[in-house]
Amino acid sequence: MRAPMPQKEQAPRMDTSPPEERLEKQNEKLNNQEEEMEFKELDDLREALANLRGLSEEERSEKAMLRSRIEDQSQLICILKRRSDEALERCQILELLNAELEEKMMQEAEKLKAQGEYTRKLEERFMTLAANHELMIRFKDEYKSENIKLREENEKLKLENSSLFSQALKDEEAKVLQLTVRCEALTGELETLKERCAQDACQAQAREKELLELQSQQACTHTKKTEQLRSQLQTLKQQHQQAVEQMAEAEETHSSLSQELQARLQTVTREKEELLQLSMERGKVLQNKQAEIRQLEEKLEIANEGRKHALERFKQEAVAVDSNLRVRELQCKVDGIQKAYDELRLQSEAFKKHSLDLLSKERELNGKLRHLFP
């Protein structure tokens, strides 16, 4: 029988344990493998002998002997190959272990070098610290001696000051007491003045509130009047819009009646003359109204100046006089002046509106005449 071919064993995995332990484990594995191989060889030889003994005389021919020799040689070749593979694996493992040991030796050498450098630096620092400590001890001794000298001099100076400046200090203390008494009296006067100022401020605030209330009432009346004027302005705008619409309608009718205008040319010329006379009369009226407006503006300016003077006089009299009757009289005067001012302002605005209406009507007439007589 041919012996089974031994399979090539896998290379052992690298262990992360230290190199000495791995080397011992590898040696143990190799020894165990050698013992197993020897036991296997002995078993194979025993099987071969048993096979030879069991053969018959006929089978023990030359051919059988050659076959057995060939098988034996093949087994020996396999054994030698396996041993050579094992030796090669051992060499590779030893080379790896040697490389790891060399790397560790280099690392340890670098660590030793760094540690030597660190110890050298520590020695240098220790020497500098020792020198600094000696200097500090010397400085401390010098400071103690100087401190003792300065204390002795300070005691001497204290004795001299107490003997020389005692009377002067007493005089200064008396002056300080006088000044403190005077300061207290002045603070009392200051408090009384503050109270008076507070009372005056309260009175002034009350008067100011009264004046503000009066001004607010006047402002309310003024706002009401302005709202009325705005409503009037709105109505005038509506009337103007209606007039514009009427003008648009008139223009439409004018386009439709363009043929009839030729027949009524004579009547239109007469109307033109009448309109011219009317425009002349209205121009004169406008000039008169403008003169009246100027007079009213002058009156307004005079009234404004009188109002300003009255307000100033009212403020002065309100500050000087505390009686309520005088304040009411002045307030009545101010109200009368304000009413006169408002009436004059309304009259001036009415005249201005009337003059503007006359001017707008004159412009409309001129526009109609231009359309009629291009």
From Swiss-Prot:
Keywords: Coiled coil, Cytoplasm, Nucleus, Phosphoprotein. The modification Phosphothreonine is found at residue 16. InterPro entries: CCDC89-like (IPR043450). GO terms for cellular component: cytoplasm; nucleus. The keyword Phosphoprotein applies. It is found in: Cytoplasm; Nucleus. It comes from the Eukaryota. Interacts with HEY1. Belongs to the CCDC89 family. This is Coiled-coil domain-containing protein 89. The lineage of its organism: Eukaryota, Metazoa, Chordata, Craniata, Vertebrata.
